[in-house]
């Protein structure tokens, strides 16, 4: 059996106001006595096939918050298909608009779906997450979508070997259902793929819009 591995998350600890850890392995060996302090926040990503681990963690007080999905592959579309939409790399002056979108539009994720985390904190986590790009602490490329010079969406990319990872993607509510997210991904693949051979992106099983988008682009469930 693998020994329990708890990895401290200083950034998330600051946001939550309590020690935060990621449980990396040794799920069936975990017990609350291993925590250096309490109360604390501990998250774990467990494969749905690891039934014993899931049951053990729930007995230790864990709750299932979401079920994550990963998609990968090459998009089957490359052209921007909507007139009136423009796409470019982000500028420093885009930070307020991008951060506002991040704070308001991410509702289906492990922070917002956790009833123990207040909405104001969940929103601040997403705001600060993308703000770290402007501080040079997160991501390699940030792209924005504009309509009539208004920033209406963004995509944060991380280059990881032969993949480019979609770290965050969001579109303002009143601009949704207009193909902006799809076009952002196509623009990124066409102009910022570098040596990447495929896209890797995660979402939640509750996010039907994202599942439809990635499937429509020809990405496959990992």
Name the predicted role of every residue range:
Residues 37-48, 163, 192-203:
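Conserved GNAT acetyl-CoA-binding A-motif
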């Amino acid at each position: 059996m693998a020994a329990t591995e708890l990895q401290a998350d200083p950034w998330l600890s600051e946001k939550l106001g309590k020690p935060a850890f990621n449980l990396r392995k040794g799920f069936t060996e975990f017990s609350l006595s291993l925590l250096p302090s309490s109360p604390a926040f501990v998250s774990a990503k467990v494969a749905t096939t690891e039934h014993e681990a899931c049951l053990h963690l729930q007995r230790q007080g864990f709750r299932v918050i979401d079920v994550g999905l990963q998609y990968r592959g090459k998009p089957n579309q490359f052209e921007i298909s909507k007139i009136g939409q423009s796409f470019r790399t982000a500028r420093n002056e885009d930070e307020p608009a991008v951060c506002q979108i991040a704070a308001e539009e991410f509702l289906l994720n492990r922070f917002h779906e956790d009833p123990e985390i207040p909405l104001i904190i969940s929103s601040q986590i997403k705001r600060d997450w993308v703000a770290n790009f402007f501080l040079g602490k997160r991501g390699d490329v940030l792209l924005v979508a504009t309509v009539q010079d208004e920033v209406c969406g963004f995509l944060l990319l991380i280059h990881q070997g032969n993949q480019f990872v979609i770290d965050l993607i969001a579109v303002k509510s009143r601009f949704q259902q207009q193909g902006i997210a799809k076009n952002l991904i196509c623009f990124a693949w066409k102009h910022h793929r570098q040596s990447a051979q495929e896209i890797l992106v995660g979402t939640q099983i509750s996010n039907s819009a994202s599942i439809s988008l990635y499937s429509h682009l020809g990405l496959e469930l990992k």
